[in-house]
């Protein structure tokens, strides 16, 4: 199955794919899955206790990094539709975690910022992930980190 997918994506006939490369790709997929599950475990638990999910975390994270972010900018960052963003953003606003202001330059533009409670939650969520990454980086060293960063930068456009 994976080999067929690889052929569709690469245009290379299945019989020309290096099986060791195929196996390494499968191993990378599995490692990526387990790493992501571990990376999100603590935030998922915190979010679940509050009736929230990963989409809420992503919104909190990017609004926290970009105060006064407007809704269209957030849509571009997240790569979702207005419809997909509407319910989770409304919930965060209703819970008092996100504040919505009208932009001074254009009354049609809504700008988003974290409230104090939102900033506290976002810090708690992100801190657990920052610590998780820091432990892994310490174990692997700078050379491995440089390689990992290159891979992560290339994945969105691969």
Regions found by a protein language model. Name each.
Residues 1-50:
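N-terminal leader segment of winged-helix/HTH proteins
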Residues 33, 61-65, 126:
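Short, locally clustered residues in the helix-turn-helix/winged-helix DNA-binding domain
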Residues 40, 90-150:
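Charged, amphipathic alpha-helical coiled-coil/dimerization segments
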Residues 41-81:
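N-terminal helix-turn-helix DNA-binding core of bacterial DNA-binding proteins
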Residues 71-72, 83, 90, 110:
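Residues within helix-turn-helix
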């Amino acid at each position: 199955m994976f080999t067929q997918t690889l052929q569709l994506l690469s245009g290379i006939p299945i019989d020309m794919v290096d099986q060791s490369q195929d196996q390494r790709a499968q191993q990378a997929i599995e490692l990526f899955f387990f790493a992501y599950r571990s990376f999100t475990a603590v935030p998922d638990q915190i979010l679940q206790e509050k009736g929230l999910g990963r989409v809420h975390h992503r919104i909190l994270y990017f609004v926290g990094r970009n105060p006064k972010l407007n809704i269209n900018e957030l849509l571009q960052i997240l790569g979702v539709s207005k419809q997909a963003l509407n319910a989770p953003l409304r919930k965060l606003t209703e819970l008092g975690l996100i504040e919505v202001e009208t932009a001074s330059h254009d009354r049609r533009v809504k700008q988003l910022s974290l409230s104090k409670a939102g900033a506290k939650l976002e810090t708690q969520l992100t801190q657990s992930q920052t610590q998780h990454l820091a432990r892994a980086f310490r174990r692997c060293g700078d050379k491995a980190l440089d390689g990992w960063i290159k891979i992560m930068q290339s994945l969105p456009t691969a």
